[in-house]
């Protein structure tokens, strides 16, 4: 990430003249309504609506007949499919921060600074990055053994299509949303989601409280990126987390900016909108967002994330994967992990335990799959309806029903287990 000069702090008089957060929200709601009234994306230079109105065309998130809360099936350049928040009537991406830090940086980059905001040495920062990567990769390794994630990753046939549909499981984005330090910076087209994070304090374990101490938090900032369909997701560096199997990323209508792979600096493509913190406004927004439950609905994998974050060990598989990805020295990485209180269990493999599978069965009985499917929109009215019904009925489809049955887990993972056994024999 290139060096940026931080903005100077506002004076007390400048803060006094700022609008409160609710006034900022109302301002952008009006701008959004004006955008829609003036023709929306058809009134700007955007990607044209495809002539054949293909159900997964890249521009379907901008041109569709879906309700605002639906997630649009869009094909990526790599041939996979993402479930993007509907941008038909959403011209902005927002990010809220309760304090003005002078610039946007990811939680990963925050590790470069100590509690006094002093820059750590390159060696110390690298060590912290290594530990953060080990934790997030342990979580990702576990998610990759989730039966339904495996099914969606491997591809599904949805009638009347003859080719498999690969739903993109954004594992790194999921790690970000479940509390792991990553190089991602979250954005949302929902200004209320951004407003919530801008006026609340994180207490940990998905719990928040409204900011009421104006002395410690006199003003915050809403960062705004005006979407350009030809630039935002192709050149500027924004990507989609969107809807995943569990509801959290969908509730937050997640997009992200990846510091680590994008040459553009995010601070150059957003506008900071400052607001004066107000205790009554904070309480109002906190209540509107159901004390945070609107953005952090209960789900079982949040518990697994918390356990991994609190655990003092990671699997040998995760350690080896991290070593392969970063091409660092084995002994050095091992020493750094131990220095920071992380031991390597060479006999441990992340996988869904019988207890986790039982919890998944309970989730499915409580409507997890139906809730996931009912948020998805396939364009092309005739074909899209058939594909939706095919998706919804996968638990009854003999080709996929075993992914929904806990007792079939060993059969689902047999191929992966065999590959591990073969690799083990080669090492010996």
Model-derived features: positions:
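Catalytic-core elements of nucleic-acid end-processing and repair enzymes
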Residues: 1-428
């Amino acid at each position: 990430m290139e060096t940026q000069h931080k903005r100077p702090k506002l004076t007390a008089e400048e803060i006094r003249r700022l609008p409160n957060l609710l006034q900022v929200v109302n301002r952008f709601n009006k701008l959004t309504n004006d955008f829609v009234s003036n023709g929306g994306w058809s009134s700007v230079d955007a990607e044209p609506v495809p002539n054949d109105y293909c159900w997964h065309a890249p521009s379907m998130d901008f041109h569709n007949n879906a309700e605002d809360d639906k997630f649009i099936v869009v094909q990526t350049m790599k041939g996979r499919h993402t479930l993007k928040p509907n941008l038909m009537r959403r011209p902005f991406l927002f990010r809220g921060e309760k304090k003005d830090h002078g610039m946007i940086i990811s939680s990963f980059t925050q590790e470069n600074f100590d509690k006094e905001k002093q820059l750590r040495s390159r060696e110390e920062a690298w060590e912290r990055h290594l530990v953060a990567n080990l934790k997030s990769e342990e979580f990702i390794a576990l998610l990759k053994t989730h039966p339904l994630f495996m099914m969606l990753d491997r591809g599904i046939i949805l009638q009347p299509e003859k080719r498999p549909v690969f739903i993109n499981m954004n594992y790194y984005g999921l790690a970000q949303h479940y509390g792991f330090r990553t190089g991602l910076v979250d954005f949302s087209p929902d200004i209320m989601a951004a407003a919530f994070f801008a006026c609340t304090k994180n207490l940990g374990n998905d719990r928040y409280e409204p900011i009421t101490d104006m002395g410690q938090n006199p003003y915050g900032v809403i960062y705004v990126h005006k979407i350009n369909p030809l630039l935002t997701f192709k050149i500027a560096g924004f990507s989609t987390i969107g809807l995943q199997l569990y509801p959290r990323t969908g509730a937050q209508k997640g997009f992200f900016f990846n510091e680590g792979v994008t040459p553009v600096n995010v601070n150059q493509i957003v506008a900071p909108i400052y607001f004066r913190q107000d205790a009554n406004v904070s309480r109002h927004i906190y209540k509107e967002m159901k004390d945070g439950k609107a953005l952090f609905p209960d789900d079982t994998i949040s518990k697994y994330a918390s356990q991994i974050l609190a655990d003092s060990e990671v699997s040998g598989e995760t350690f080896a994967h991290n070593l392969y990805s970063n091409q660092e020295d084995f002994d050095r990485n091992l020493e750094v992990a131990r220095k920071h209180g992380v031991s390597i269990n060479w006999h441990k493999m992340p996988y869904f335990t019988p207890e986790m599978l039982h919890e998944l069965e309970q989730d499915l009985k409580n409507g997890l799959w139906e809730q996931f499917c009912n948020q998805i929109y396939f364009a092309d009215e005739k074909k899209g309806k058939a594909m939706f019904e095919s998706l919804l009925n996968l638990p009854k489809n003999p080709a996929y029903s075993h992914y929904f049955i806990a007792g079939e887990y060993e059969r689902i993972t047999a191929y992966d287990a065999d590959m591990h056994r073969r690799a083990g024999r080669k090492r010996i």
